[in-house]
């Protein structure tokens, strides 16, 4: 359910880039932002009111999952959550590089702005299917394994973006990146759901997404800063791949601890 809900982001990514491109050419980017803000205001506020009812309180026997007096994965619960938050910064800083700068990178290589906008639509179109598929994968192999798969795919495609220059190569890379990156974020909510008590899910998931916003902002800014230093985006994508390695290392640590705790429980 989490992945199906989050897949709406992919649909939006298909619809909005060509619309924004058209409005930018017609009325300018400032006016485009203004009218988009009005659209968000008149649609999101009424839709949010549909969710105003408080959820049914969880029963007492559901308020404890993997958490116990021994901590989580043999560590402090807040330490585990901090590791997940840092992992989120790593993956989001990496994914922001192509999301924010792919259009500029393509136009620098000689693509028209319309073709460059198509790349973003292809990327998010693939992302829609990715979230559905990764949601099914989470149900089969768990959130941490799925996170490792998605993060690994994202790292590979960032390396590809740093070297590809042909139109067909960009189209293929955009689709494959979309298939990899967009299944990552729902994994964190599901990992937290498994590791932490139900009564802590709200604030822990909120913090997780706050760090995701920090990561996206960092990646978007850093991509531009690297461009200013090097005159191109290829090195920015390599920097993004480096952040992705940080994510893989932290997620791998959680995976190893989870397996170790599972083995200890079986031995006991």
How should these model regions be labeled?
Residues 1, 183-196:
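Intracellular juxtamembrane helix-capping segments at the cytosolic ends
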Residues 5, 9-55:
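Helix-loop-helix hairpin linking two adjacent transmembrane segments in secondary transporters
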Residues 79-136:
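Extracytoplasmic gate region of multi-pass secondary transporters
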Residues 130-142, 227-228:
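Helix-to-loop junctions at the C-terminal end of transmembrane segments
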Residues 153-165:
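C-terminal ends and interior cores of transmembrane alpha-helices
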Residues 157, 168-176:
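Paired small-residue
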Residues 195-232, 240:
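A late C-terminal transmembrane helix in Major Facilitator Superfamily
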